[in-house]
Structure formats: structure tokens, C-alpha cells
Amino acid sequence: MPMIETRTDRMLLNFGPHHPSMHGVLRLLVTLDGENIVDCEPVIGYLHRGMEKIAENRTVVQYLPYVSRWDYGAGMFNEAITVNAVEKLAGIPVPRRASYLRVIMLELTRITNHLLWFGPFLADLGAQTPFLYAMREREWILDLFEAVTGMRLINNNYFRVGGVAVDLPYGWTEKCLDFCEYFLPKVDEYERLVTDNPIFRRRLEGIGVISKQDAINWGLSGPMLRACGVNWDLRKVDHYECYDDFDWEVAVYPEGDCLARYRVRMKEMRESCKIVQQAVKALPGGPFENLEAKRMLEGPKSEWNKGDYQFISKKPSANFKIPKGEAYVRVESAKGELGIYIVGDDNVCPWRWKIRPPGFVNLQVLPQLIRGMKVADMIAILGSIDIIMGEVDR
């Protein structure tokens, strides 16, 4: 009687760099025993463009348009950390109004990032419709960006050393508040559709678990860290910009699995929306059209022309020199701790520009999370990390 030969050796499978669920040019060398994952080796570098070396051969003004290509899903965080590094090293003050404008833009960028994560993540799990809902809401924010900066997704080039490029256009604050009122019920709608769906929960609950101590040891940050029960958010820890002026909560869940990472991001969208509402309503000087009218009414010596009501303290010259010294500056981006280590030597270009991207650090834990899991679970785990290869490879 003929016998069916059973394959006993392990299979080496390539996922990516062109697989649609890799979310960029990421290649995973996966060792399989049947359907079970034995090992995984991420292969990176396909999107390396030498961003650190470019920074060391450009002035800050020249380099700013480049930085949107790190995390191209949330480009304004890259601009924020670029100008913050120079401001800290050179001791450049930022007007209060400019700080509020920065916070508004950063939190809107956080929402766009999470929407861009939410849609494809659900599509990876087999739910196609939420992707269309997420893009519908994201379009509102891109229209707001376009009204202020002229660009929609990347290359906003809005942040400047000492402030921002321009003030808000007429009527922008009203449209922004309209979006916030529209968006918060939509997040509730997403939750009703998705969160308690039994298929969705079975795909995520208890999958890709990492303990609190392991998350700290690996150096994880952002939603990856807060989903392990660690209450760590740089907006609260470092007190940068004007986040202390607003009432908001850090999203923390203790389970450490894919579902907890999903819930952290959903809550962060709500909290970001609340921060935007508070910042717009408390904007120093109010909407730009009102501020401009007050200045015209009271003349050149009006208090509304003073520093706190300006959108930039002083524009740096083209030959602005970065003073001698070193500094490490970080912001809480949508994916975690985005940091810059800068060394200046009293020259127009920095002597050293080291980028600390959150995605690069968070990706390191992937092999540990997927060993012993099924192939389908690997897609869910990778999606829950939220990887953008532009910042991983730099």
C-alpha cells in the first residue's frame, strides 16, 4: 500500500518586501513548522536614504523639507523634533501662541496617524469597510492641513525654529472645532462596530502578549509601552510645549496584547480631539481674524503685537549657526518616543545628528512576539506595532 510522505523539515518563507501586509518595504524571513512560526528575522534597510548624513551637510532651514520622509504617515512630528533640538541647544524662545498652534497641529497629526493605522489594520484582519470610514474622517484633517500649509499629507514644512511658518487662515478655527464635534461620535461608532465583534476579539485577545518588564527592557515606547500598563507619555513626563495647560488623560491598558494596543490608540484619538478643542478655544489672541482686527484697532503699540501673540519669535537667518554643545530632545510621536541627539560645533550645520525613531526600537520585539504563533497571528501582531519603514530605515 503506498504511503503519503509527510514533510518533516522546516520551511523558510519570505514575507515581503512587497507583501501588502508588511506596511512598507519590510522583509521577514519566517521559519515555519507547518503553520506554526518557529523563528523570524526582520530584514530592513530597503528604504535607507541617509537622513542623518544629509542633516550633517545642510543648514536647519535647508533640512526641514527633508524630515517629512522619516515617518511619512505623521510628518509634523518630524518637523517638531527637528526645530525643538535646535531651539534647546541655542536657547531660542517660542511664543505662547506658536506653542498652541504647534500642539493643535501635532494632535491632528496624531489622529491622522491612528486613522491611517486603524483602516489597514482592520483590512489585514478581514474587515474592509472600516478602512473607508477612516479615510473619510482623515480627509477632514488633510483639508485643514492644506488650508494652513498648502500641503495635505507630507511636506507640510510648517514648523520653524522659534515658532511656525504662518498664522491660521480666516475661519480655520471654526472648521477645526466643527471637525472635533463631528469626529468624536465617529470614534464611538468605530468602537460599536469593531471592539466587541467576536471574530475581532478572537484574532487579537491574548495574541502578541508582552509583559510590563519586558516592554521596559526592550525600550518600547508609545502605544506599545502603554498597552503593557506603563503610564509613560512624554507629553506628561517632559512637559514640553504647552500640554500642561490642557485637561487630558494618558491611555493605559494593562493586558499587553494586540487588543490592548488597539484600545490605547482608540482612546488616544479621543484625547487628542479633546486637546485640540481646548487649544483652539484657549488660543492666545483667539482666531487670527479677531487678532488682526484688534491689532488694527489699537495700532502698532497694541499689546496684541507683543511676543506671546506672535506665531514666531524671530526668523533665523540663512547662515544661523548652531552653537557649540550637545543635547538630546524627544517628543511623544504617534508611534512613541521620537528623539534627536544633536551635537553643534558653532557652525551652520550640526556636527552630529542622531535620530532615535520609535518604530525601529518597537520592531525589534517582533520575533519574540510571534514565536510559537500561527502565520495569521503574525499579520495581526505586526499590524498592532504600527510600523512605518521610512523612520525605521531613515
UniProtKB/Swiss-Prot annotation:
It comes from the Bacteria. It catalyses: a plastoquinone + NADH + (n+1) H(+)(in) = a plastoquinol + NAD(+) + n H(+)(out); a plastoquinone + NADPH + (n+1) H(+)(in) = a plastoquinol + NADP(+) + n H(+)(out). Its EC number is 7.1.1.-. Belongs to the complex I 49 kDa subunit family. This is NAD(P)H-quinone oxidoreductase subunit H. One of its GO terms (molecular function) is oxidoreductase activity, acting on NAD(P)H, quinone or similar compound as acceptor. NDH-1 can be composed of about 15 different subunits; different subcomplexes with different compositions have been identified which probably have different functions. The gene is ndhH. It is found in: Cellular thylakoid membrane. SUPFAM superfamilies: HydB/Nqo4-like. GO terms for biological process: photosynthesis, light reaction. NDH-1 shuttles electrons from an unknown electron donor, via FMN and iron-sulfur (Fe-S) centers, to quinones in the respiratory and/or the photosynthetic chain. The immediate electron acceptor for the enzyme in this species is believed to be plastoquinone. Couples the redox reaction to proton translocation, and thus conserves the redox energy in a proton gradient. Cyanobacterial NDH-1 also plays a role in inorganic carbon-concentration. The keyword NAD applies. Its main location: membrane. InterPro entries: NADH_Q_OxRdtase_suD, NADH_UbQ_OxRdtase_49kDa_CS, NDH1_su_D/H, NiFe-Hase_large. It is a peripheral membrane protein. One of its GO terms (cellular component) is plasma membrane-derived thylakoid membrane. NCBIfam families: NuoD (TIGR01962), PRK06075.1 (NF004739), PRK07415.1 (NF005649). Keywords: Membrane, NAD, NADP, Plastoquinone, Quinone, Thylakoid, Translocase, Transport.
